């Protein structure tokens, strides 16, 4: 979203989690009245925000050391959606997010997702080569045009669809949306290519939750590498201990030692 608005010439303010090359960091102060903020639900921090527009990508069993149950997370997201004044753009393909949106009124509710029953959805997804993915962006059955991404993974196709929906809601043209997404090369520690040694490519990714790990590994294994090795460092012991036991599909795994706790 930040990349799209910046490319479209909006002098926005931004406060995001990863370092974004186009703004030379994770934040900037602009002259317009538009600000993008990557909100976090941990300890209900995002309930201190009162956004005009909220984008809900998904809801998963995360931060269980604070919330205790997924139901409590869903309730927190419901409260966040209620705090939003104009529009909530949410993942209509995610059951937990849909549950959080039940009973939300007084604002426009717009869905994005994997299938045609959502307002915005991708069609004809093609993984061209390496990090490049093409798809057609659809809006309520109508094709808006082609999107070209230079970031890996099916999850980023949905992220791009959500960003496009939000940008067009605030008046950005499809042409500027497509241009901004084509110029997006990822953020720091989000499948970030660090370099190459011989035939080995080193990628750094912040993923430490099972769903994030699965998405990242699927993206890596869809690329033309002969073998994928995952070196995993739990984020913190307390948080990792609260996560459910899951099986991750990865060819090779080396467990990294956590030094934070």
Residues of each region from the PLM?
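Phosphate-binding loop of NTP-binding sites
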Residues: 1-92, 96-108, 161, 168-170, ...
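Well-ordered beta-strand scaffold positions
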Residues: 32-34, 40, 125, 140-142, ...
């Amino acid at each position: 979203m930040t990349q799209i608005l910046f490319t479209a010439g909006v002098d926005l303010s931004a406060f995001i989690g990863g370092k974004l090359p186009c703004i030379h960091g994770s934040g900037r102060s602009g002259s317009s009245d538009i600000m993008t903020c990557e909100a976090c639900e941990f300890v209900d921090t995002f309930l201190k925000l009162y956004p005009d527009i909220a984008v809900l990508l998904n809801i998963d069993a995360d931060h269980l050391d604070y919330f205790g149950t997924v139901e409590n997370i869903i309730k927190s997201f419901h409260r966040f959606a209620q705090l939003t004044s104009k529009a909530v753009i949410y993942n209509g393909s995610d059951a937990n997010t849909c549950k959080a949106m039940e009973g939300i009124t007084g604002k426009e509710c717009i869905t994005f997702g994997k299938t045609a029953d959502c307002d915005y959805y991708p069609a004809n997804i093609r993984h061209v080569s390496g990090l490049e993915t093409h798809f057609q962006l659809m809006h309520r059955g109508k094709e808006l045009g082609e999107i070209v991404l230079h970031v890996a993974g099916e999850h980023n196709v949905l992220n791009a669809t959500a960003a496009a929906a939000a940008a067009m809601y605030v008046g950005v043209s499809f042409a500027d949306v497509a241009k901004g997404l084509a110029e997006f090369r990822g953020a720091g520690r989000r499948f970030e290519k660090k370099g190459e040694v011989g035939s080995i490519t080193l990628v750094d990714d912040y993923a430490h939750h099972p769903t994030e790990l699965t998405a990242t590994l699927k993206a890596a294994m869809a690329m033309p590498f002969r073998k994928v090795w995952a070196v995993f460092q739990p984020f913190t012991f307390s948080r990792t201990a609260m996560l459910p036991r899951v099986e991750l599909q990865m060819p090779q795994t080396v467990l990294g030692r956590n030094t934070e706790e």
